């Protein structure tokens, strides 16, 4: 077994705190509209320049194993906050550092770490309640754009494009971020349900200029098996022909004989038809076919539903106002499904998302929700260089998450002011003993930290800024972008409540663990053996 180094009490805590400080000091320079850039070396290619706190945190590994423990602990704060709220990673890191530094002074003075932790937990609970009271909901295009702009480091263009995307696909719609091909940001919205399967044969194309098949007021057949015999299809083809409507066939596959008949019918103009393969594989394919069925009002022809293809009728078919089939994808627009059934299906998938254990499953389920709930928006990020593109995409991603969080739980005044105002909740709180009271004071002091860092990064004196902000009330605060004081909500300087809440919760949780640490165990450095030692110089 590998030998271990063990450190106890102050020796253990001091090394961890050093690591906490190294990581936090590197991350906090990015905080606020006047935050600085961090340049990160890559193993190959150009270095990355970023103002994204979690990107900086993820790159840091320290040589000293004990110090590295501290850095990795705080890295967890940033990562967890990013996972839950999508933003606020730098704020969480700054808060964690402040609580650790204040707490260590009290531990060094001989106070009980467990009582300090109880005091911290009590104070954080009160502050979270106060943040909920300060929070207000957002809904307008302007408010959503403001939140997006703040999270993208005061880039109004990013805020506007995110607000436009949300307006078009709804707050539950999928918004994806891709590399653009021009210098400008672009928004591309796919309305209706899109899946990544195109026509089985190019002979179904009825618009050669666009290389696509367009079916208006179409009937839709859904089948979970291969269609090999044309005899099985005849009843449906005849029914569609009599109804005078085009037909879209979605099946596992359409084999040669059946495909040839469909192509001939289509080319002769007897029946406007197109066939595509069903999306997904295995159980996911069954689920997606069921989604399509609910969206279009169809019944999936399968053994599980007790339906046979050769006995299918018009009642088993779904319909949509328009279907667009291209080489690689199919879009079904304005399906005839029942709105209540679609809503129930969305709720059912959301339950599965909450229970999903893998990120991949969760992502696929979220895609299904978005397709049912309303379209997909693609933000194409434009930039001059690859380095700028990477940095800009990180900011768009942050802003997107923050905007979703704001729509979910509302907004509070930004720039660290909400945390400063929430300190009012601590004025009447007392712990069970003096050590718990000290824990409450630790949080009271730490809540100033984000505003201090924002002011320092903007080149102002933090103590003067805090004093001035405390003279005002409510939304009155310091706008670091302009260097002026005023109503931050009116100025568009806002933070999502969920981001601020998550940052404080995670910071306090991790900081409390550091304060209550009494021993650390790390792998001992390997001693160089005599064989691997460098040869002595012989002097000639």
Swiss-Prot record:
> Which reaction does this chain catalyze?
ATP + H2O + a folded polypeptide = ADP + phosphate + an unfolded polypeptide
Q: Which UniProt keywords apply?
A: ATP-binding, Chaperone, Cytoplasm, Isomerase, Nucleotide-binding
CDD domains xrefs? GroEL
- Coiled-coil region: none
**Entry's localization field:** Cytoplasm
Fill in the subunit field for this protein. Forms a cylinder of 14 subunits composed of two heptameric rings stacked back-to-back. Interacts with the co-chaperonin GroES.
PANTHER family tied to this protein = 60 KDA HEAT SHOCK PROTEIN, MITOCHONDRIAL (PTHR45633)
Question: What protein name applies here?
Answer: Chaperonin GroEL 3
Which organism does this sequence originate in? Burkholderia cenocepacia (strain HI2424)
């Amino acid at each position: 077994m590998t030998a271990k180094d063990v450190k106890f009490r102050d020796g253990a805590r001091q090394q961890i705190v050093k690591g906490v400080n190294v990581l936090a000091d590197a991350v906090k320079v990015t905080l606020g509209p006047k935050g600085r850039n961090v340049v990160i070396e890559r193993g190959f290619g150009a270095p990355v320049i970023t103002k994204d706190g979690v990107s900086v945190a993820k790159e840091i590994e320290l040589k000293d194993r004990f110090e590295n423990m501290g850095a990795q602990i705080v890295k967890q704060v940033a990562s967890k906050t990013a996972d839950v709220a999508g933003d606020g990673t730098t704020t969480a890191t700054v808060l964690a550092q402040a609580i650790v530094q204040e707490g260590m002074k009290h531990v060094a003075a001989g106070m009980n770490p467990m009582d300090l932790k109880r005091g911290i937990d009590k104070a954080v609970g009160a502050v979270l309640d106060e943040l909920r009271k300060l929070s207000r909901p957002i809904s307008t295009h302007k408010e959503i754009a403001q939140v997006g702009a703040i999270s993208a480091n005061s880039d109004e263009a990013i805020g506007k494009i995110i607000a436009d995307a949300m307006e078009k696909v709804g707050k539950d719609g999928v918004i994806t971020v891709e590399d653009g091909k021009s210098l400008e940001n672009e928004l591309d919205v796919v309305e209706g349900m899109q899946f990544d399967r195109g026509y089985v044969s190019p002979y179904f194309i009825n618009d050669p200029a666009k290389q696509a098949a367009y079916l208006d007021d179409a009937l839709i057949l859904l089948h979970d098996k291969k269609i090999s015999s044309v005899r099985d299809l005849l009843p449906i083809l005849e029914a569609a022909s009599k109804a005078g409507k085009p037909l879209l066939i979605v099946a596992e596959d359409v084999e040669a004989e059946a495909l040839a008949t469909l192509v001939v019918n289509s080319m002769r103009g007897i029946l406007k038809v197109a066939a595509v393969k069903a999306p997904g594989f295995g159980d996911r394919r069954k689920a997606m076919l069921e989604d399509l069925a609910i969206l279009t009002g169809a019944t999936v022809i399968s053994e599980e539903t007790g339906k046979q293809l050769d006995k299918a009728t018009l009642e088993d078919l779904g319909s949509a106002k328009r279907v667009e089939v291209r080489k690689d994808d199919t879009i079904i627009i304005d399906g005839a499904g029942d709105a209540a059934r679609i809503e129930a299906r969305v709720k059912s998938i959301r339950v599965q998302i909450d229970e999903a254990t893998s990120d991949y499953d969760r992502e696929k389920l979220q895609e299904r929700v978005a397709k049912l709930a309303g379209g997909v928006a693609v933000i194409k990020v434009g930039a001059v260089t690859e380095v700028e593109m990477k940095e800009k995409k990180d900011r768009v991603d942050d802003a997107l998450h923050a905007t979703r969080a704001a729509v979910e739980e509302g907004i509070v005044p930004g720039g660290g002011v909400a945390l400063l105002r929430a300190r009012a909740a601590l004025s009447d709180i007392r712990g069970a003993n003096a050590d718990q009271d000290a824990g409450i004071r630790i949080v009271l002091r730490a809540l100033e930290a984000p505003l201090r860092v924002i002011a320092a990064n903007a080149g102002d004196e933090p103590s003067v800024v805090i004093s001035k902000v405390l003279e005002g009330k409510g939304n009155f605060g310091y706008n670091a972008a302009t260097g002026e004081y005023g109503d931050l909500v009116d100025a568009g300087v806002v933070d999502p409540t969920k981001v601020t809440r998550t940052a404080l919760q995670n910071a306090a949780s991790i900081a409390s663990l550091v304060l209550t640490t009494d021993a650390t165990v790390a792998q001992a450095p390997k001693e160089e053996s005599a064989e691997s030692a460098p040869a002595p110089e012989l002097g000639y």
